[in-house]
Amino acid sequence: MIVNVIGAGLAGSEVTYNLGKRGIRVRLFEMRPKKMTEVHKTGYFAELVCSNSLKSEDITNAEGLLKAEMRLMGSITLEAAEKARVPSGKALAVDRNIFAKEVTEAVESLESVEIIREEVTEFDPEEGIWVVATGPATSDGLLPFLKKLLGDDFLFFFDAVSPIVTFESIDMERAFWGDRFGKGKDYINCPLTKEEYEEFWKALVEAEVIEMEDFDRKLLFERCQPIEEIARSGKDALRYGPLRPTGLVDPRTGKEPYAVIQLRREDKEGRFYSLVGFQTRLKWSEQKRVLRKIPCLRNAEIVRYGVMHRNVYINSPKLLDIFFRLKKHPNIFFAGQITGVEGYMESAASGIYVAYNVHRILKGLSPLKLPEETMMGALFSYIIEKVEGDLKPMYANFGLLPPLKVRVKDKFEKRKKLAERAIETMKKFLEENPW
């Protein structure tokens, strides 16, 4: 039987690769580059559109634990990330183009995978196995069919992307290198005095934004909230948020600045840097004007402006079973951010999970739920079984895991024990239920 996968993002690529490398015939549909979305720039698979950071690898961090579990199950996302890694302190950050190219070439190399560069606008829900992994930027051509298939259980939130500037246009006479509390030198820090901060804040809150159809401030998801929305919540909101100076000492003064804008490397050569936490929906002309208020970026060359787009996801608790299958059509699976998991790694992890169970079904076995002691199992259980009311996008966090049997007061030690339990549980699960 052929497995049809719609969408070659992180989740779709994981589904395709994990099935294809095991000899399962897969037909992968990807409309790019023939038809582009409003946020993608290339035709590569697994293109990262929000940030180039895949976050922490430390297992005492929820994102790091998630990665550890994904490696145990097998992840093309993490294999490609290792080859595309750029310096980013304790975080795993990648060169976007190298990363996407690595994933694309890995999928294309599989003999059992057929790649069709066409937009899917409909399919027969009664025939074959389908995996819908079209992501938050699902095409307008497919949406009407999905709405007809699913009913009115579509939700959405708004997402925003940060600007990118060239390294050579940054005033390094005023900027300084460093991570918080002296842990490395991977970030460029642009310090602001009180007067400079207030001038920047005033320009930001007064700047014109791009209005969007159906825009509602309450729909802005907190992890990608536009910087101008944060600024409007209070004059010091940025100083306690993305511009907080904590742990960053300016070597010129020997003190923490009043506020700091951090820039993170975007490519291996270090030619481009993105503004950390600067997701925005400002008009492009306003972005240029506002960034000029930052002394280190007074002459910055912006190579990608921040943009904002609407993300689509489905009401998974109502529509899907725990294996991410449609309750009405169990031959149709959903994977990735369209299910309500939030984040790059969470999206990729859901693709691995779907591939694992599709593989079991094709072998004549029953699908399996991952143990809730694992981060993957806890996240997927929350999305499908534990949400009350309408689903809100959810990312990996330790609050999802069942408590330890013995109370541990120290926060770090508690997370360490939760992580160790999760990894051991996943290892045992895979030993008993291998691919």
From Swiss-Prot:
GO molecular function: flavin adenine dinucleotide binding; tRNA (uracil(54)-C5)-methyltransferase activity, 5,10-methylenetetrahydrofolate-dependent
InterPro entries membership: FAD/NAD-bd_sf (IPR036188), MnmG-rel (IPR002218), MnmG_N (IPR040131), TrmFO (IPR004417)
GO BP field: tRNA methylation; tRNA wobble uridine modification
Cofactor(s) annotated in UniProt: FAD
Keyword annotations of the record: Cytoplasm, FAD, Flavoprotein, Methyltransferase, NAD, NADP, Transferase, tRNA processing
UniProt similarity note: Belongs to the MnmG family. TrmFO subfamily.
Top-level taxon of origin: Bacteria
Protein location: Cytoplasm
Native species: Thermotoga sp. (strain RQ2)
Binding residues for FAD: G7, A8, G9, L10, A11, G12
Protein's job: Catalyzes the folate-dependent formation of 5-methyl-uridine at position 54 (M-5-U54) in all tRNAs.
Main localization of the protein described in the UniProt heading: cytoplasm
Class in the EC hierarchy, top level: transferase
Protein name, per record: Methylenetetrahydrofolate--tRNA-(uracil-5-)-methyltransferase TrmFO
Reactions catalysed: uridine(54) in tRNA + (6R)-5,10-methylene-5,6,7,8-tetrahydrofolate + NADH + H(+) = 5-methyluridine(54) in tRNA + (6S)-5,6,7,8-tetrahydrofolate + NAD(+); uridine(54) in tRNA + (6R)-5,10-methylene-5,6,7,8-tetrahydrofolate + NADPH + H(+) = 5-methyluridine(54) in tRNA + (6S)-5,6,7,8-tetrahydrofolate + NADP(+)
UniProt keyword annotation of Ligase present: no
GO annotations of cellular component type: cytosol
This enzyme's EC code(s): 2.1.1.74
